[in-house]
């Protein structure tokens, strides 16, 4: 799906072509591409991403699943356009996929599309539209890893390989400790993909190799190397983006104080014993010492994202997508933003008694009687006026190319909260991030919606549910 630049999402929504009353938009909750890979799903759709809290995730669809059939039609017998039409047809709310992966040669997965009125705007979309209210919670971030990934030139289907085991570890205690860590991480990642350990007769043998030491060829750093921007990557062990002591891959090796190499080989034991099926190698140039075990724990999951479906042969690009927000279940009218179009069944707003066609006059005392362009203009002005309250040390370029993404300065939370409280900033939708102290210093767990219904004014207290989503995908 084509990405819309986040800072313009809100404006974009309201300049799109008018939706027809009663029309619906639906989603299954995954993206896919047609494979040209001889080892996985050749000429068939392969699932590239499964969206959090979507029908696909609930049904158990997984990344790298190969779609074999749609509503019992074999994808090999229809065109790419037919596949697109069958998956996106708005008149069909139910669909039956037959998928293929390591665990199953074929598995039928019934899916029910999640459908909304074309007139509605949900809180997931609003969280993205107002992401600068809390970049800490909602952003897309691009990062690179210097991996080189190669596969056998033989046209062999990797799904034939179901089991694995590890090469014998060395007797040396320090090496045994390192390989134990590497093998445990690999075991976790491969079992997630549906493979299993078989020590007696494995289909694949996994071999790891590694080195880490001071660089014997180090001479002197140039000014350009000393002034390189820091390298940030996602640290799965800490669940956050972290700064690492790595240099750019283009740095001359003689200017790096330390070097690290980590490689993984999957070796055929089933069809042609000894043949290397898949290999991924990381080579890092480093400015400081770093634990090989820690490197492996963070980077092996990223390396394994290219098995069995390889997209990049070198310098792999990843996107971390993070979104956390307060969910009430209210869906707003795109063209009359303070009108409720619908309420998600069983949601906090439904339980509190908010109904479709209610007019929201205020949220936590903040007025809602403005047009969408007025909200958009005020949001942009808010971003400009509060730049001085952000921490410049956290500046990063997001996955859409915006260079000025920054977190709030933790020493200025009281000033930030005052900016959110100003009436002329039109920050009613900051309730989406009211769990943060820079939005809501009292950290209250409820929101008050002042509504108008058939001429009657009501005050309704809603207790939102915290929704959190995070995905890492190949770009």
Language-model regions, residue ranges each:
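C-terminal/domain-edge helix-coil "capping" segments
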Residues: 104-105, 114-153, 276, 283-335, ...
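N-terminal segment of the mature soluble domain
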Residues: 163-222
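Bacterial Sec-dependent N-terminal signal peptides
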Residues: 1-24
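PDZ-domain C-terminal substructure recognizer with occasional recognition of PDZ-binding tails
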Residues: 20-22, 83-126, 377-470
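A structural "domain/chain start" motif
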Residues: 42-43, 59, 120-181, 335-336, ...
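Surface-exposed short loop/turn segments
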Residues: 22-23, 38, 209-273, 432
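PDZ/PDZ-like peptide-tail recognition elements
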Residues: 20-49, 86-88, 297-344, 350, ...
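Conserved PDZ fold ligand-binding element
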Residues: 56-79, 349-379, 383-390, 417-420
């Amino acid at each position: 799906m084509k990405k819309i630049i986040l800072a313009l999402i809100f404006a974009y929504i309201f300049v799109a072509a008018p939706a027809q009353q009663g029309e619906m938009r639906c989603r299954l909750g995954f993206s896919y591409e047609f494979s040209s890979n001889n080892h996985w799903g050749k000429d068939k759709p392969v699932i590239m991403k499964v969206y959090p809290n979507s029908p696909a995730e609930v049904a158990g669809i997984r990344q790298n699943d190969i779609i074999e059939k749609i509503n019992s039609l074999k994808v090999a017998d229809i065109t790419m356009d037919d596949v697109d039409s069958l998956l996106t047809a708005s008149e069909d709310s139910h669909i039956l996929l037959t998928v293929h992966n390591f665990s199953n040669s074929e598995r039928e997965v019934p899916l029910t599309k999640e459908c909304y009125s074309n007139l509605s705007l949900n809180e997931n979309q609003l969280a993205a539209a107002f992401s600068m209210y809390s970049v800490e919670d909602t952003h897309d971030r691009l990062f690179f890893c210097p991996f080189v990934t190669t596969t056998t030139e033989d046209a062999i289907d990797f799904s034939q390989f179901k089991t694995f085991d590890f090469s014998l570890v060395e007797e040396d205690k320090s090496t045994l400790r390192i390989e134990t860590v590497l093998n445990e991480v690999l075991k976790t990642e491969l079992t997630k993909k549906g493979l299993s350990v078989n020590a007696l007769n494995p289909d694949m043998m996994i071999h790891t190799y590694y080195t880490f030491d001071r660089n014997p060829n180090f001479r002197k750093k140039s000014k350009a190397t000393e002034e390189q921007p820091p390298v940030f990557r996602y640290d799965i062990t800490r669940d956050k983006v972290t700064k690492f002591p790595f240099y750019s891959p283009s740095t001359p090796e003689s200017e790096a104080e330390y070097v690290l190499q980590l490689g993984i080989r999957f070796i055929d034991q089933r069809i042609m014993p000894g043949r290397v099926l898949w290999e991924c190698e990381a080579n890092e140039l480093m400015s400081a010492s770093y634990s090989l075990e820690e490197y492996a724990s963070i980077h092996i999951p990223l390396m394994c994202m290219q098995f069995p479906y390889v997209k990049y042969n070198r310098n792999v690009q990843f996107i971390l997508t993070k979104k956390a927000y307060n969910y009430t279940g209210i869906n707003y009218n795109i063209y009359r933003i303070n009108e409720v179009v619908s309420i998600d069944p069983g949601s906090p707003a439904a339980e509190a008694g908010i109904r479709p066609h209610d007019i929201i006059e205020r949220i936590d005392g903040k007025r809602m009687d403005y047009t969408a362009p007025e909200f958009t203009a005020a949001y942009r002005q808010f971003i400009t006026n509060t730049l001085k309250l952000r921490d410049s040390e956290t500046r990063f370029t997001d996955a859409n190319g915006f260079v000025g993404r920054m977190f709030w300065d933790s020493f200025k939370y009281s000033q930030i909260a005052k900016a959110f409280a100003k009436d002329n900033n039109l920050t009613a939708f900051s309730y989406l991030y009211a769990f943060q102290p820079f939005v809501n210093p009292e950290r209250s767990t409820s929101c008050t919606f002042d509504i108008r219904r058939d001429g009657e004014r009501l005050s309704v207290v809603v207790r939102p549910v915290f929704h959190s989503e995070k995905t890492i995908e190949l770009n």
